[in-house]
């Protein structure tokens, strides 16, 4: 999530004079969906049944892969258990994360590459080769018919939550500066999101 947008060159790269934000030195230059931003990497783990956010995290590191284990620890601390299934996009896919999930006995589904919108990979066929590495095993798993169906759930579980927070509620940038304050602000956004979900569920059940 940005603290501010960055000027870019014709090639789409950040300009050389946009390498540091003196008003928020904790923030880093990150690649976002709309180009380069000066901001933070916001993480959210979302319950598949009710779109409740069960864990959050904020850092200034661009790679999502390094955030998986800390997020799993937060999920465990907040809920007392790990999820029955874990669905994550390609940013979280790494050999270490795949092997760690296998060691935990966690039924994980990591996208092994970014797919164009509306396109699905060709299903895997035949017995799996015995010499597949971690990425090969995961690629085969998510290309199965069952794997494709499970991975498709991410578009109706996680992505709508970010859309509701950033698009519907207009919370698309941080108002405060510094990693600690940004973390608190993101936690507050998640809390109010959950309150809204619980309120609507209570009204529906009344």
Q: Can you describe what each PLM-predicted range is?
A:
Residues 1-206:
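Anion-binding and metal-coordination hotspots
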